[in-house]
Amino acid sequence: MNHDSFSSLKFRRPSSKLHKDPPSIGSRMLKSQQSNTSLKRHPSAPVYPRSSASRSREHSRTRSNAYGSSTSSLDQNSGGPSPVLANNESGYFSGNHNTTKSRPPHSGRFSLNDQSSDELIGSPFDSRGMLSALQENTAESDRQPIQKPPTLRSQTTPDTRGLRQSASFTALHNRMDALVNRTDSDRSTNTKRYSDEGNGTKPVGRSKKASFSSFVNSMLGSPRGIKISAPENPVHVTHVGYDNQTGQFTGLPKEWQRLLQESGISKKEQEEHPQTMVDIMRFYEKNAQGDDEVWHKFDHAYAHHHPVTTSSSQPSSGGSTPYGTVGQRASSPTSPRFPQNHEGSFENPRAPPPIPRGAPAATQAMSPPVGGLVPNRAPPRPPAAANMTPARPAPQPPTTASYATTRPVQDPWPQFGTIPENAQPFGTPPIPESEPLPSGPQLSRSNSKANGATAPWVSPAVTPSPTQYQQQQEQAMATAQQAIASKQLDRSQSLRQQQAQQPKQKQATHPTPQQVSPVEDPSAALQQSARAVPAARPRQRARQSNAMDIRSRLVAICTPGDPTKMYYNLNKIGQGASGGVFTAYHNGTGSCVAIKQMNLDLQPKKDLIINEIIVMKDSKHKNIVNFLDSYLHGLDLWVVMEYMEGGSLTDVVTFNIMSEGQIAAVCRETLNGLQHLHSKGVIHRDIKSDNILLSLDGNIKLTDFGFCAQINDSHNKRNTMVGTPYWMAPEVVTRKEYGRKVDIWSLGIMAIEMIEGEPPYLTESPLRALYLIATNGTPTIKDEQSLTPVFRDFLHLALKVDPEKRASAHDLLKHPFMSFCAPLSHLAPLVKAARLSRAQEKAQKGGH
């Protein structure tokens, strides 16, 4: 059958008159087979009654008033009950083809006349043509205003008498069922049964798209909504505030509350300066995570009066070595106040005081001094004249027994010059060797065991009376890290055991400089392992460079070659957690040099090493320790520097009383070095007597550039809290932005150190010292009236709290106090006296 003849409802008749006889049965069967679709009548389509008596010779069209088009209507008996409605509610067969012409019997049209239904049974029908007609009729009916018919009622039952359905109609309605996609339940609740009954319904084309989309979604599944899981491994960050109404801190952890109670800061002081306390506690909060290297400084603040089992010939800690780059900051606090061997007199005897990081810690002097807690050596009297020369001989060091019994009571932070280097740690069997230490034996001037036990630096046969006082010292600085320390305990203990054997194996298998030097003590390895297992430091890990990147940068700045073939006669004079300090002689010139060996794997901040090397290379000045060379030898970094055999300024201020002329000379040389650094945009940030080295001739040079910071026009301020607490400027303590003037404040504190023998607040806990620096501002001098007015004015300008009003290095170099400067040769006797006093101290303690 030709499909084009059924593309619309208007067909051309081959003749104007048809015979009554219908097509033969065979013809109908043949055409029925051509219809490839079995159609079924829609279940809800109305059944129209027919009059069996109306028959005629022709197929004449019967116009129906119940439909909009006579071409799509079914003849019915209007007299009987019927669901046929006006305006063609069904909508399936609506159209605009209003014609009365008769049609061919085989045209496939589905309108019927009064002819008997028996004659049309099995009449063929083309579904594709019907679908095209439906789409056209639907589009036309959408453009015509249609009056909404009344709703069909369930009581309306059509009269089905005399009507037999054709198989074509049944197949057609099944096809339309799939296209319209309606259910009986939908039509029972919705009066708009078909697409042409309402303006809001979708055409058949859209229904096809909807059906296809539903099919695809059913096959592929609808996209799932985004699900956000709960946070994993959350970390609680402590937030500390201050309630102005109640005058109390809010959000303080128990450890901090106990720390404040034991630090000697009264509630009255806390209420008087709440913002200062918040700043200090935030400082603790930040650095408890190990973000700043200042904690290393705290760790070694008082290393000299805590014992660690070492051989009597073990040299002092590299942490007290002025040549120790990062090793000085992360050094082992195993050394006493002064080095063991005389050749190490250049060594930095007093390591910077850091706050513990997961190591056994105890803060010293947490409460006011108990009766008898007076330094053995009274502070030196300020000089009366500029040309005054030291007249007091070095004090005799106490014996081991007297030190063990009286020293803990007199001063938890011993005064310099009175502590024999072979005191309890070296002269008597120490206790802590057999005791388990949390996360490493980090015993230092500000440290003890984190569990709050009595500090193990007292002789086993003698126990100090103020044990409770000592316990307070131990707990003060450890509380912020107890949780972290407990987590690191197991791993750090195993690593300590492994690394304790490494120095012995290295000595047995490799001819390294350690063989030339005295035997290393196992405690140094323990200190190294403790440093190798630092506490959790999330922020620092984010900022640390990759290990390979660090090594590549070091390769770029280091000299290629084997340093063991360039230097000979290495003598170990110091030991730190990162390595040892040696003196050696150059093969070519025969000059004596200082070599700092650092194990890169043990460095907490490798960037500081690179920073220090770069600063020293670019800072050639007569008042800065001369950097000679650097080498990468295996896993160690060798830094070769000028050897200052006179030692540090700390030795001089400990064993001698300095005149104003000598103090002025030291200040002048230090200011010259600072001016050079500041002109290059470098801030030293750790000026103190420990980092001022002297030669035997009295020449003065700066050292330890690991904490240097670069500033420029775009970044001319810093806010990182680094340095040693007792020498820190107020703007650093309160975490404000700072610049070059922080070095000037530290110089003023160092001047007080040369007057009194120690910096202000040294007998206070580090936390209270920070509080006093922030609240008191300019410190007071014990006997200020004995100073000349010019010297007092010099100190006043250097110790201005407001950095804008504080003098610069250039200003102080022009100050009248500089005219008091004594020749540098006048410092040579002080250096020699300090060396002699140290040698006598060793002899009395059995040192060799």
From Swiss-Prot:
Residues 65-102, 152-171, 328-338, 441-451 have a biased composition (Polar residues). Residues 228-241 form the CRIB domain. Residues 1-208, 306-547 are annotated as: Disordered. CDD domains: CRIB_PAK_like, STKc_PAK. It catalyses: L-seryl-[protein] + ATP = O-phospho-L-seryl-[protein] + ADP + H(+); L-threonyl-[protein] + ATP = O-phospho-L-threonyl-[protein] + ADP + H(+). Keywords: ATP-binding, Cytoplasm, Kinase, Nucleotide-binding, Nucleus, Pheromone response, Serine/threonine-protein kinase, Transferase. It is an enzyme of class 2 (transferase). Residues 427-439 have a biased composition (Pro residues). ATP binds at I573, G574, Q575, G576, A577, S578, G579, G580, V581, K596. GO terms for molecular function: ATP binding; histone H2BS14 kinase activity; MAP kinase kinase kinase kinase activity; protein serine kinase activity. InterPro entries: CRIB_dom (IPR000095), CRIB_dom_sf (IPR036936), Kinase-like_dom_sf (IPR011009), PAK3-like (IPR051931), PAK_BD (IPR033923), Prot_kinase_dom (IPR000719), Protein_kinase_ATP_BS (IPR017441), Ser/Thr_kinase_AS (IPR008271). Residues 567-818 form the Protein kinase domain. One of its GO terms (cellular component) is mating projection tip. The active site is at D686. It comes from the Eukaryota. It is found in: Cytoplasm; Nucleus. One of its GO terms (biological process) is signal transduction involved in filamentous growth. Belongs to the protein kinase superfamily. STE Ser/Thr protein kinase family. STE20 subfamily. MAP4K component of the MAPK pathway required for the mating pheromone response and the regulation of cell polarity and cell cycle. This is Serine/threonine-protein kinase ste20.
